[in-house]
């Protein structure tokens, strides 16, 4: 088995991940972001990180995630998101603050119907079950209420 890692531009975190996996003895290959959808048929699962996971299962992630997730869906390859609890937002994706111009060039909203499950420290959840997780973790709502006005005023 081999791990295919996207470069993940512009920061290129994939380069670090491939180096760490290789150092651990895991066969890993770096794939250009634009090439990843074409390589999805070679995989058993697509594992994504997320910048934000909304209560309805919508994901905010880097540009290029939607084509990868759609290619996976079309190939019958499950898409799984791994995210820390702190990245959960207590509102649905439709209520996400508008992205600033520079953010629109870097991020996009991935619909929940492209995601099979989300893995957190609290366990694995179907996108439809995230609301119950968010409701159990009060600091998510409190933190969001503090930062949402800042995002709206930029």
Regions inferred by a protein language model and the residue ranges of each:
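Conserved S-adenosyl-L-methionine
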Residues: 1-2
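Conserved phosphate- and dinucleotide-binding cores of soluble alpha/beta proteins
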Residues: 6-154
């Amino acid at each position: 088995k081999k791990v295919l890692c996207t470069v993940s531009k512009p920061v290129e975190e994939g380069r670090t991940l491939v180096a760490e996996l290789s150092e651990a003895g895991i066969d890993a290959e770096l794939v250009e972001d634009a090439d990843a959808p074409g390589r999805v048929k070679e995989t058993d699962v697509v594992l994504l990180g997320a910048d934000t996971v909304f209560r309805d299962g919508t994901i905010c992630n880097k540009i290029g995630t939607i084509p990868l997730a759609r290619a996976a869906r079309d190939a019958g390859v499950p898409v799984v998101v791994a995210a820390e609890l702190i990245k959960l937002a207590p509102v649905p994706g439709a209520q996400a603050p508008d992205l600033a111009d520079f953010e629109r060039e870097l991020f996009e909203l991935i619909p929940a119907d492209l995601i099979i499950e989300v893995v957190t420290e609290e366990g694995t959840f179907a996108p439809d079950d995230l609301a119950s997780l968010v409701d159990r973790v009060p600091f998510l709502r409190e933190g969001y209420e503090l930062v949402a006005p800042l995002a709206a005023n930029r």
